[in-house]
């Protein structure tokens, strides 16, 4: 019975280690920066027959890597969204925005600071959205001003045609 228990524990530990390796390989293939060395620690525990510790470490390791991948995906989305917003701001509204800010996001990303990318990217995106909204509002006000000026010009011309001699050159 003790042998059966040990075999079951061994099998669960081996499965946990195998799953953690697969997840680690996926993270590595995506070039996600991961400085966690828990996998080698798990392998060491396994070689020492510490199967319970391997199982527990595997659960924690998998949870950390899953969270890391989630952060990485969110950081990718933020960078993409910010880049597209910058392109739109430049092409549709003529807004010139500092590319150094995008470079800063890329630097944080390459260093594996995905939380920093998310935090800074969301702030930059909000600021750029506000700038675009202000530009749209300014364009609308300019258009309204041009329309009122044209109406006034037409009124002045109409008065001039009717022989009104008052000065309408305001």
Listing of model-derived features with the role each one plays in the protein:
Residues 1-170:
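Long, charged/polar, soluble alpha-helical segments
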């Amino acid at each position: 019975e003790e042998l059966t228990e040990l075999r079951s524990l061994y099998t669960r530990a081996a499965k946990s280690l195998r799953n953690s390796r697969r997840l680690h390989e996926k993270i590595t293939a995506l070039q996600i920066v991961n400085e966690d060395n828990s996998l080698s620690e798990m392998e060491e525990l396994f070689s020492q027959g510490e199967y319970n510790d391997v199982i527990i470490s595997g659960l924690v390791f998998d949870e950390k890597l899953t969270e890391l991948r989630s952060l990485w995906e969110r950081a990718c989305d933020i960078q993409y969204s910010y880049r597209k917003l910058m392109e739109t701001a430049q092409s549709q509204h003529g807004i010139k925005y500092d590319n150094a800010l995008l470079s800063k996001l890329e630097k944080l990303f390459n260093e594996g600071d995905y939380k920093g990318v998310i935090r800074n990217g969301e702030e930059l995106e909000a600021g750029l959205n506000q700038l675009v909204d202000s530009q749209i509002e300014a364009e609308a006000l300019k258009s309204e001003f041009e329309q009122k000026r044209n109406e006034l010009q037409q009124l002045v011309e109409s008065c001039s045609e009717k022989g009104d001699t008052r000065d309408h050159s305001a």
